[in-house]
């Protein structure tokens, strides 16, 4: 049985037509579409159990709290984490990186310590570090990306040192589809420093089976809306012993143990990092998204992504005038950023929309690397579980027609 053959039927959005044409959605790198089960799970809370979590002794609150905390355990199993207390809920991956950058810098780093990033990172994994580097007198170093859009591991070995305290890299590039060898990078870090290893899982977690114990990393960050869940929910996983060392960076209700007029003490991990009313309905939607993916199995999701990528590489290989930013590594994601000589990416995207094809145009929050390439913007096609070979064929034909019309 092919689990993906009729999968669009699970997603109400695909009942829409765009400009009298079937929707061809190739922008899952920005956000995924949502299956009916996720929408229904969230509606069920509002219709039947809605109440604030952790704070009520009545039935509705107890039911909602059980659903909400149950998602923490689902995330633990989904990542093969050591303990559900290692799962920190945030409002997204960006907030997750801001939390880590501020909490780690505040508690564990000293002036002159170094942070290593790659030059192909998303802004969410650059700007928070820039902000804390300025505040705490830290130094950021960048690892180059080679002509194949892969991380230069020789340069990593040269730049990492005992002064390196944080290495934070993408698990899957939202620009080129690069899937770095995380375990190899982990071994390089261990040989040369005691740095914390953080992985940006925003693109990785929706497409690959992630086992944090096997990878040997210290933290991973991802958002719910890219893996079939709603906006407004994200996850930081971190090793419990490290989380216990960190201080909260946001204060308020639900993260405290005792409050006095002149001081306060914190609740245990994970709650000390989750101030205020949490996005409990969004978390429950994330849990339904995880259930949906695990019903398929992440192994099959990964294989589908690989099959799409290989087909795309084949049909895109002869595109006239089109330059493609995509790694040629054996393992990569189904993410293709492109530009056409003498035609702006936004014009291409607007023209593709007339054919019902949805792609992203811009710098995809990887502006420094676009600048290095001398490109103002690209348009990007990203595939997911509800895409098939026909979607890629429609995209290619629409792209060729768009180029012909735009000159």
Annotate each predicted stretch with a short phrase.
Residues 1-407:
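Pyridoxal 5′-phosphate
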């Amino acid at each position: 049985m092919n689990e993906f053959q009729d999968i669009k039927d699970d997603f109400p959005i695909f009942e829409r037509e765009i400009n009298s044409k079937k929707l061809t959605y190739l922008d899952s790198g920005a956000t995924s579409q949502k299956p009916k089960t996720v929408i229904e799970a969230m509606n069920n809370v509002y219709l039947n159990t809605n109440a604030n979590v952790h704070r009520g002794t009545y039935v509705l609150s107890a039911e909602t709290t059980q659903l909400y905390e149950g998602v923490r355990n689902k995330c633990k199993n989904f990542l093969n984490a050591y303990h559900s207390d290692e799962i920190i809920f945030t409002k997204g991956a960006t907030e997750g990186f801001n939390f880590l950058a501020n909490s780690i810098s505040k508690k564990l780093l000293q002036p002159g310590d170094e942070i290593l990033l790659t030059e192909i990172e998303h802004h969410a994994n650059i700007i928070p570090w820039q902000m804390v580097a300025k505040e705490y007198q830290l130094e950021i170093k960048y690892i180059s990306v080679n002509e194949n859009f892969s991380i230069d591991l020789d340069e990593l070995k040269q730049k990492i040192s005992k002064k390196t305290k944080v290495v934070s890299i993408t698990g899957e590039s939202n620009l080129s589809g690069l899937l770095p060898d995380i375990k190899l990078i982990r071994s390089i870090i261990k040989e040369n420093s005691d740095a914390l290893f953080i992985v940006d899982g925003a693109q990785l977690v929706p497409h690959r089976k992630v086992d944090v114990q096997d990878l040997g990393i210290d933290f991973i960050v991802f958002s719910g809306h890219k893996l079939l869940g709603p906006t407004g929910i994200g996850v930081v996983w971190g090793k419990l012993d490290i989380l216990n060392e960190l201080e909260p960076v946001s204060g308020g209700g639900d993260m405290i143990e005792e409050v006095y007029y002149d001081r306060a003490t914190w609740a245990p991990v994970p709650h000390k990092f989750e101030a205020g009313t949490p996005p409990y309905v969004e978390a429950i939607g994330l849990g339904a998204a995880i259930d949906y993916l695990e019903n398929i199995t992440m192994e099959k999701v990964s294989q589908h992504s690989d099959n799409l990528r290989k087909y795309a590489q084949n049909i895109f290989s002869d595109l006239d005038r089109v330059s493609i930013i995509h790694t040629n590594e054996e393992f990569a994601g189904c993410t293709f950023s492109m530009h056409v000589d003498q035609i702006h990416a936004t014009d291409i995207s607007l023209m593709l929309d007339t054919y019902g094809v949805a792609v992203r145009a811009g710098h995809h929050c990887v502006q420094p690397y676009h600048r290095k390439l001398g490109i103002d913007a690209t348009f990007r096609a990203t595939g997911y579980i509800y895409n098939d070979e026909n979607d890629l064929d429609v995209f290619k034909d629409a792209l060729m027609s768009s180029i012909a019309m735009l000159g």
